[in-house]
From Swiss-Prot:
Its biological purpose: Participates in chromosomal partition during cell division. May act via the formation of a condensin-like complex containing Smc and ScpB that pull DNA away from mid-cell into both cell halves.
Protein name as catalogued: Segregation and condensation protein A
PANTHER family: SEGREGATION AND CONDENSATION PROTEIN A
Annotated GO CC locations: cytoplasm
Description of how the protein assembles with itself and partners: Component of a cohesin-like complex composed of ScpA, ScpB and the Smc homodimer, in which ScpA and ScpB bind to the head domain of Smc. The presence of the three proteins is required for the association of the complex with DNA.
Compartments, as annotated in UniProt: Cytoplasm
Length: 242
């Protein structure tokens, strides 16, 4: 029942935007960033998009194929000096694209801030209309939530594969998981993101739990925060006003 909710990531404009976010987590010069871990995170992200039955645009898949080429060349034994030079050139070209995109984003943000300042003196800014059935991940912190789930999904997938015992397939619905999470947060105001998935028995339950969480976040029943880079995401029940 995964398709009950549609997910969109606002202001996430393409593969370079995702790569820039992944690279920025290292807080160092772009050309010094370890590229293989970034590539692995990107590929896991794409795989998770498919697991959630979300449409993956062609440009993401094209970038994925380029990244897989770079990663495979990194893993192959050194053949010739030309091979090394070609691989290094591929990596440099990719990082140069990301750096160029970063500069574009900075300029775009500056222009947007200028536009916002000018709009105060003129007409009211237009309002974006969002349909009720859409779960909108509104900023890059929400992207961090999504990326955190990709890591859990990858780890748990391996765990499920390693399990020798076969458990009868159980059907999970988003509605049931919403009720389960609501009950949990009634009893426990604060919870670690990773703890929500610790008792999941299969991939379907993982995904359904995540979709239910997104619905609760959309309805402003749950908030989330991340205290430090790569740190644990903390979920908290929002108090309802009487």
């Amino acid at each position: 029942m995964i398709k009950e909710i549609n997910i969109k990531i606002k202001n996430f404009e393409g593969p370079l935007d995702l790569l820039l976010h992944l690279v920025s987590q290292y807080e160092m010069d772009i050309f010094e960033v370890p590229l293989v871990p970034v590539i692995e995170q990107y590929l896991i992200y794409i795989q998770t998009m498919k697991e959630l039955e979300l449409e993956v645009a062609g440009e993401y898949m094209l970038m994925a194929s380029q990244l897989m080429l770079i990663k495979s060349r990194r893993l192959l034994p050194t053949v010739t000096e030309t091979f090394i030079e070609d691989t290094e050139q591929l990596e440099y070209d990719l990082l140069a694209q990301i750096d160029e995109y970063r500069k574009y984003k900075m300029l775009s943000q500056d222009l947007d801030e200028l536009h916002q300042e000018r709009s105060h003196f003129y007409s009211k800014a237009k309002t974006e209309i969002i349909t009720d059935e859409t779960v909108l991940l509104q900023d890059k912190s929400a992207l961090d939530l999504f990326l955190a789930f990709t890591k859990i999904l990858e780890l748990q997938r391996q765990h499920f594969q390693d399990e020798n015992t076969k458990i009868a397939a159980e059907k999970f619905t988003i509605a049931d998981k919403i009720l389960e999470l609501s009950t949990r947060f009634t009893e426990q105001k604060i919870c670690k993101f990773s703890d929500l998935f610790s008792s999941s028995t299969n991939k379907d339950e993982l995904v359904t739990t995540f979709m239910a969480l997104l619905e609760l976040i959309k309805n402003q029943q749950i908030s989330f925060s991340q205290g430090e880079l790569f740190g644990e995401i903390i979920l908290e029940r929002k108090e309802t006003s009487e």
